[in-house]
Amino acid sequence: MSKKVLVFGGTGYQGGSVVRELLKDDSFKVITLSRNPESEKCKELKKLGADVIKCDESQPKEEIEKVMKGCDCVYLVTNSQGYCEKEIEYGIKVADVALKCGVKHFIFSTVPGPNKLSNGKFKSPDLDNKVEIEQHIRQLSKSNPEFISSFVIAPWYFQNFINYYQPEKESSTSDKYILKWACDPKVSLDYGDIDELGLLVREIFKNPIKFSGETVPFSSEILTPIQIVEIISKVTNKKVSYQFIDPVEYGKSYDLEVSLMLAFFNEYGGFNIYGGDRSIAHNIKKLTSFEEYLKKINYKLD
């Protein structure tokens, strides 16, 4: 008998990967939520076999409960952008409804929390909010052992270097490029093709007892910014250099939330601070490297 899985954020990077991967397996029936079920992304998911229902985590408990009744499993990824202080409220609400509805296995996409790990030296709402939600879910499982919870940590997406952190030309007439970012050039962080996250989530859903209470990191490669520009140079056959921008200045000119994250990671590093076994994802399937990803999408610098 197939497990009925409710996936939040099915039109986003993480949720979309989870939906697509679960739909490849006949042992899962997938439902996902959207504020606009008639969007092109939702239509694509419907074609693959997903049920798309008009709802999201901002809806009242009663509405979420209607959708969640009868579900065996839930995958929750929360969104700080647009919600901010509401993210914690929404995440806790979804977990509480899942317990009430008899959900057997709940997977939450969490992150290392700067405020907790640095004893208040660093703070990042985008990261710290998720830690509070994780702690609430863990307490629910502790008080209700039949409510199994597991956690995944997503890395910095390879996709970010296509959509957000693009190398720029040194000048309008130059054939040389610069990647400007706030990650210390000597700091190694975890990266991956987020389209492959669903592989790991499917494995966890298939083995609830094994992964009960576990935090499992998804990481294809551990790279420094210098290694990143070297790979971009190799694939594009263009000269790409790296320019470190202090996180404080980066936050003023580019992206405040990213600057807060990187200020923390520059001092504390990647997933090592959180623990967890990176090899689990690698043992499921050979994961795509950054070089392979760029070649796969035919990445170019114009």
UniProtKB/Swiss-Prot annotation:
Family affiliation: Belongs to the NmrA-type oxidoreductase family.
Function: May be a redox sensor protein.
Native species: Dictyostelium discoideum (Social amoeba)
Protein name listed in UniProt: NmrA-like family domain-containing protein DDB_G0286605
Keyword terms, alphabetized: NADP
Residues where NADP(+) binds: 9-14, 35-39, 56-57, 78-80, 130, 157-160
PANTHER family: NITROGEN METABOLITE REPRESSION PROTEIN NMRA FAMILY MEMBER, NMRA LIKE REDOX SENSOR 1-RELATED
InterPro entries: NAD(P)-bd_dom_sf, NmrA-like, NmrA-like_oxidored
Disulphide-bonded residues: none
GO cellular component: nucleus
Cross-referenced Pfam families: NmrA
